[in-house]
Amino acid sequence: MKTSMFLTLTGLVLLFVVCYASESEEKEFPKELLSSIFAADSDFKVEERGCLGDKCDYNNGCCSGYVCPRTWKWCVLAGPWRR
């Protein structure tokens, strides 16, 4: 009787530990996935913001695809809607 109670209790403790470890791994996976997505997103933003919003003057031009308008002192996207 004592042996069966000991084995039952040991089995329940082992089951609890395995379930806890499994949930812990499942919780880490979304965190790792989100951190890798945001890391890639921040790398993209660094490349995109290379010229957009940089201060400019008429002597120092902007990158290709950007213009330095007369009204503002920073580089903006060139487009057909701009005069």
UniProtKB/Swiss-Prot annotation:
Cell compartment(s), UniProt: Secreted
Disulfide bonds: 51-63, 56-68, 62-75
Tissue: Expressed by the venom gland.
Signal peptide: 1-21
Propeptide: 22-49
Primary subcellular site in the record, as a coarse category: secreted
SUPFAM superfamilies attached to this UniProt entry: omega toxin-like
PROSITE patterns on file: HWTX_1
GO CC list: extracellular region
Keyword Signal found: yes
Alphabetical UniProt keywords: Cleavage on pair of basic residues, Disulfide bond, Knottin, Lectin, Secreted, Signal, Toxin
MF GO annotations: carbohydrate binding; ion channel inhibitor activity; toxin activity
Family per similarity comment: Belongs to the neurotoxin 10 (Hwtx-1) family. 51 (Hntx-8) subfamily. Hntx-8 sub-subfamily.
Known function: Agglutinates erythrocytes.
The record's note on its domains: The presence of a 'disulfide through disulfide knot' structurally defines this protein as a knottin.
Name assigned to this protein: U5-theraphotoxin-Hs1d
Lineage, top ranks: Eukaryota, Metazoa, Ecdysozoa, Arthropoda, Chelicerata
